[in-house]
Structure formats: C-alpha cells, structure tokens
C-alpha cells in the first residue's frame, strides 16, 4: 500500500477493519492538505491540537510526538485504527489520547483539524462543543474531498466559530479555515427525540445516530417479526443504533439477557439512555466495539441485526458480511441470527454460505427478514 508522506512523517497506515487485498488506502488528499497547511503555519511543540473524525489516524499519528495532540470522534473502529497505526509506526498505542464523542474534551486548543463527517449533525455538535475550548488566536481547519464537502459545512463553521476562508482545490481536496470570533454561546439541538407507537417508546438520538429524526424503514419492517418466547436466552443487538430492536425484544422477553453493541459511541450512549427510560434498572450490557469481535465463541443464543451498508463515504456489504461471520462465531450450535436487509443485497445467499439453515421470516416490497440457524 502507498505510504503517507508529509512534512511531518512517512507513515505506513492500514484501514480498520482490516481486509485482505483491500484496494482502499487509509488516507486521502484531504489528510495531506491538512497536514501541509498546519506545517506551513510552523506551530511550536507546545501547540495543542485537537483532531476530529480522523478515520484511521493519518492526522494524529503524523503529529504524535511533535505537537500536543488529542484525537476525538464517534467511531470505535477509527479509535482501533489509531491505536494500530501508532504501534505500526513505532509509537506506543496510547501516545495520542482519544476522547469518544460521548465524552467531553478538557482544556484549550490552539488548532483544531477536522475531517468533515458524513453526518453534518455530528459536525454541528462538535462545533458547538468547541465553544469554550478554543485558545486566543485559535483556528479551526476542516478538510474533505470536494465531492464530500457540502456548502453547509462552511455555513456551520461560520455560525459557531467565526469567518471562514475556503482554500484553493488541491488534488480534489479543499480546506475551510475558521478564525475564532466572538459568537453567542449556542445551545445544542441534540439529542433529538421521536415517538414510536408500537411499542410505545420515546427514543433519544444523539447527533451521529443513524436516522435520528425517525425510525428507519428497515427497522420498521423488522419490529413486528422479532423472535418471541426467548426464555432466558442471551441476545445481542449487533449494530444497535439507538437500541430500539433490543428494547422492543426485551419488552416481550422479560427473562432474556441483552447486549447492545455498536461501533458508534453516540449510538451506544443513545441505546443506554433509551433502555433506562423503557426498562428502568433491568440489567443489560452496552458496548462500543468492533461488532462481536471480542465476544466469547458460542456465548450467544440469538443475534438481532440491521446491518449497515456503508463506512463513512464507502458503500458496500463488507461490514454486513463481517457481522454475519462474527455472529456465526458467537452463536451456540442451534442459535439464530435474525436480520433485515434490502431485497437487492442478496443476503439470503450470503448467509447460506455460513449457516446450516436460512429461512425467510417475512418480506415487504423492499425488505426481507431472514433467520439463519447455526
């Protein structure tokens, strides 16, 4: 794979999760542009830099040991990528502190480097949180490939930080630089909430949660067909989002044990808050993780999953396929994976390669609900 070569370092970086013969690299021209811009400003070694939404550590690893760097974002996979790429390049895995998006930063920062996220609500929440964390003379520099840089990103920076200057394009990337100006302290519009009729739930959704304004149509199709009579089964909601699948299932299965897993810290935070609101102090596990990668083999009876079909701006079924493999490893013999998916994705044939029995539980014109038994 190509090396990331910048004025700061030459790095060998990998994506997370790792895939054999992965054609995609772990950095892009926007990373290079951000690092070149920062280097041109010649900050001293005491400069505190906050890096936001660094996909696999390209920015933070480049600056580690040279400036006072803190990394933050909503992706546990990005956090794993940062740790792996630090050690891969001769640094200790904890040499750059990481702050999950469900937590808050400490202190003031002189520079903030931002990779513009796919979800602008996350960017807005981060810009609002920056108020009170920017040192005098600080700059916020956001970077993205032009095809992934909406006009609204600059508007949000102008609204919450200060005047914005757009750079010239370079290798199809562009930077937006905001200089701190006096702005009224903003109140965050997040988390958002919506009401569900069946079951009757009020659901909290932090800024980066998928379909935070309302129930997605795949989950809506899945809910009436969740498994019943689970007894004391051990159940995982894999890619739990705001936790609605696990919560709806738990309401009908009072003796089952639940684990809610997502790679988004804000999703896990939302799921935990929603569980408490719906089920009080009933025990459950809430985990930000790389799916079921750390779960003991043959330790689950049921897995519920509405698999994602993209990682940031990359679309494909590689994450779903990986989740299916993880579910197979974690399930006991005779255990079952229940999923919902778009018809055109062909999940039935993919599951048949991993499980001894696959059946269609229900279908709509757009979705299928499948049960795969190990």
Swiss-Prot record:
It is found in: Cytoplasm. It holds the Pfam family MTS. Its EC number is 2.1.1.174. Belongs to the methyltransferase superfamily. RlmG family. The keyword Hydrolase does not apply. One of its GO terms (cellular component) is cytoplasm. GO terms for molecular function: 23S rRNA (guanine(1835)-N(2))-methyltransferase activity; nucleic acid binding. This is Ribosomal RNA large subunit methyltransferase G. CDD domains: AdoMet_MTases. It comes from the Bacteria. The gene is rlmG. PANTHER family: RIBOSOMAL RNA LARGE SUBUNIT METHYLTRANSFERASE G, RIBOSOMAL RNA SMALL SUBUNIT METHYLTRANSFERASE C.
